[in-house]
């Protein structure tokens, strides 16, 4: 799996396209971290000390998602903690178990992904989150702005609603809203999702987990976001 994973990343990078991933454990990053430009720590791992230590040693910006209950405190604390030196159990380039020593990651930031209580991508939620970061110990992350995950709790796992969320964010960017530095979207070749089944029964390019925005719609949304960013820059 790691061999194929690295080959896919190498092929993507050869196109001049940066790659991102969600970090799940402290071992596999050693195989692919040099091919990743941005990483995420998921909502269920945001409070994990191991993932805070891992993020402190990754040579890329890392986004901590708000907790599944909507709280950003754990993510803010994680951003703060990951900025310091740590040690954690991992492997070296030869595959030997080591105690990895980190230097701290100054580029950690918050990702708003909604919650079990509803979405938090609206302008007021963004403003409040940035304000909360400023008054917390995580003064650095507040300067980086935040990323909005248009999937998960922000769209109710509905790919059509997810596309609408992206359009709403783009409109706000075009009107000059600051603080949003990135957007996440769940996209695949074929829209929607399917239940896991034997390979010969699966639709190629369709998700077997969360519903995804189809590629044609993704292409449109990326152009919409690009135009919105251009408009925001021009307004400065």
Predicted regions, residues:
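Glycine-rich, aromatic-flanked loop segments that form ligand/cofactor-binding clefts
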Residues: 12-31, 93-94
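Active-site beta-loop-alpha junctions enriched in small/polar residues
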Residues: 22-26, 67-69, 113-117, 151-155, ...
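Conserved mixed alpha/beta catalytic, RNA-binding, or beta-rich assembly cores of soluble enzyme
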Residues: 74, 78-167
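Loop-centered beta-sheet repeat module
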Residues: 38-93
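A structural motif corresponding to the C-terminal end of an alpha-helix
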Residues: 8-17, 57-58, 105, 132-143, ...
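Short, small-residue-biased leader/transition segments that mark boundaries at the very start
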Residues: 3-4
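Hydrophobic faces of well-ordered beta-strands that scaffold small-molecule active sites
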Residues: 19-21, 62-64, 108-112, 146-148, ...
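Catalytic-face loop-and-helix region of soluble metabolic enzyme cores
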Residues: 141, 147-220, 225-231
């Amino acid at each position: 799996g790691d061999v194929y994973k690295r080959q896919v990343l190498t092929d993507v990078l050869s196109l001049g396209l940066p790659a991102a991933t969600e970090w799940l454990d402290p071992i596999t990053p050693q195989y692919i971290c040099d091919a990743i430009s941005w990483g995420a720590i998921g909502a269920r791992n945001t409070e994990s000390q191991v993932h805070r230590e891992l993020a402190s040693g990754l040579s890329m910006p890392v986004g901590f998602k708000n907790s599944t209950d909507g709280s950003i405190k754990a993510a803010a604390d994680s951003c703060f903690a990951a900025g310091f030196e740590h040690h954690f159990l991992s492997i070296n380039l030869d595959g030997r178990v080591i105690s990895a020593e980190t230097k701290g990651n100054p580029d950690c930031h918050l990702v708003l992904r909604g919650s079990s209580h509803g979405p938090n991508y609206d302008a007021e939620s963004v403003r409040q989150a940035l304000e909360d970061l400023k008054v917390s110990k995580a003064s650095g992350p507040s300067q980086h702005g935040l990323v909005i995950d248009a999937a998960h709790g922000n769209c109710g796992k509905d790919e059509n609603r997810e596309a609408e969320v992206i359009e709403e964010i783009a409109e706000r960017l075009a009107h000059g809203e600051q603080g949003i530095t990135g957007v996440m979207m769940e996209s695949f070749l074929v829209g929607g999702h399917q239940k896991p089944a034997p390979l010969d029964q699966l639709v190629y390019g369709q998700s077997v987990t969360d519903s995804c925005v189809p590629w044609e719609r993704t292409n449109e949304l990326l152009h919409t976001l690009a135009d919105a960013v251009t408009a925001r820059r021009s307004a400065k």
